């Protein structure tokens, strides 16, 4: 799979979970304050796994839909707090966030833009944190990370901090080339974003649920995002599902604006599909019971040690 089948193919427990849920409640929407047991159970599980600041979950069917939703929620949030000009979102060159109109614009790969008239307005792209490819001669990883953080600050100041809403990135870039950033890169980026009231969005569609040896890539890099986007391995891709986690602060701003308007005019027929959520719950149980995240950390360390033996070849 595409960084997505964590428990392997033909896992009977996931198949049986889908069958049980189809027999019990095969479909149910989540509009008008409706919910169901799989939604409650999975949301509680995700909140327990995630960093402490996250308290609310919104479900979509894919990472592309999730990142589209994040763009809308960020705009909705800022409109609600009287900052309608705070719309611009900074992504990164070589980053990948999906292929719908907004998420495809966030993606920083030219073939996802060409002849699709992308990116749309208010989407910007900062430099890619690929030290081996883009560092100056003799520039250390620490110096490289500082330079990129400085460039990000310059971009925000050039655009106007009151117009920049968020910065989005994958903790480790996937489709752009499996690019591992310098160790302090994310801390420096976060410091700049906090300085200018810019939300930090961690796209963990690939890195979530153990790919970096911890539940989420943001934990690996000591990153404290405001929004967490999850998909792929949440169900080991046996069912289409993505989840957006936000903090109480963001939720309250969105809820207050929804109350003024009368509703939050966003959602999908199959948002929080009960079968997908039931499969996700069983999938996370399998990952935990078989200690797959711990195994990724152990095997990853051993792989690195062995690869270093070839450094002079």
Per-segment meaning from a language model:
Residues 1-313:
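Conserved N-terminal phosphate-binding loop of PLP-dependent enzymes in the Aspartate aminotransferase
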